[in-house]
């Protein structure tokens, strides 16, 4: 059996690949949780900031000899990713990450390792008035500066088989403030404590699936939507008397495992 291609550490890539797609397949049929009214994504616009790395033993001459006959230009990587987002028939960033990773392997036979990190570029609905009534626009969207979902994936080629070696989903840069109900007591500097104070938190939350294929969204009832995770976290933050950040994180982790057994 060949050694793990990632262990060779011969890889390079490109970041800030901005890709946008309109009218992707909607995400529907996800499982309901009590803390969230989220039922799916229309995916009228799907945007992502993507970082890609590719590697393999075949790239060694480019590193040690400057011989570039097998090197894939980073601008070509960008075009490849943007084109395949247009071809993608699924509804999630995780599914696209798998799809484009496999496409790299199928197109370039000398690649042994692909890493894709795809961060959502979120857009929110705006309202418009037509026929005298106020409603959500299905043509105009506003870029959000709030939290964003992320898909991280590594795939390797071993003995002519493609293996998904790592996969995780995330919500990044979630910022919340609770104006009361947070008490930090029994610490060393007691005179500096306040039994009821506002608490502003920044959170990055990551999760993995028991079955990696559930991450792609092809079976929606087994897919964990980042929007549901946000709603779950805000509900826990509201209902928990926060005695420490550690306790809050513990409660969030436990409830995520209960609500999403997959």
Please report, for each region that a protein language model flagged, where it lies by residue.
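N-terminal intrinsically disordered, cationic/polar leader segments
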Residues: 1-262
């Amino acid at each position: 059996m060949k050694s793990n291609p990632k262990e060779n550490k011969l890889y390079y890539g490109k970041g800030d690949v901005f890709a946008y797609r309109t009218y992707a397949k909607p995400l529907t049929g996800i499982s309901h949780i009590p803390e969230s009214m989220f039922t799916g994504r229309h995916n009228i616009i799907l945007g992502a900031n993507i970082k890609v790395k590719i590697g393999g033993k075949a790239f060694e001459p480019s590193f040690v000899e400057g011989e570039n006959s097998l090197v894939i230009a980073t601008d070509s990587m960008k075009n490849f990713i943007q084109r395949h987002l247009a071809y993608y028939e699924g509804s999630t960033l995780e599914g696209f990450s798998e799809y484009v990773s496999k496409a790299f392997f199928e197109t370039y036979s000398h690649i042994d390792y692909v890493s894709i990190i795809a961060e959502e570029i979120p857009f929110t609905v705006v309202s418009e008035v037509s026929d005298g009534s106020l409603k959500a626009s299905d043509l105009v969207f506003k870029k959000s500066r709030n939290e964003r979902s992320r898909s991280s994936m590594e795939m390797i080629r071993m003995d002519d088989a493609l293996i998904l070696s790592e996969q995780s989903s995330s919500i990044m840069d979630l910022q919340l403030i609770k104006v009361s109900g947070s008490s930090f007591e029994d610490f060393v500097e007691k005179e500096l404590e306040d039994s009821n104070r506002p608490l502003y938190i920044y959170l990055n939350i990551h999760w993995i699936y028991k079955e990696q294929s559930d991450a792609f969204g092809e079976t929606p009832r087994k897919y964990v939507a980042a929007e549901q995770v946000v709603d779950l976290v805000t509900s826990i933050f509201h209902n928990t008397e926060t005695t420490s950040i550690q306790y809050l994180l513990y409660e969030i982790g436990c409830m995520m495992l209960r609500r999403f057994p997959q």
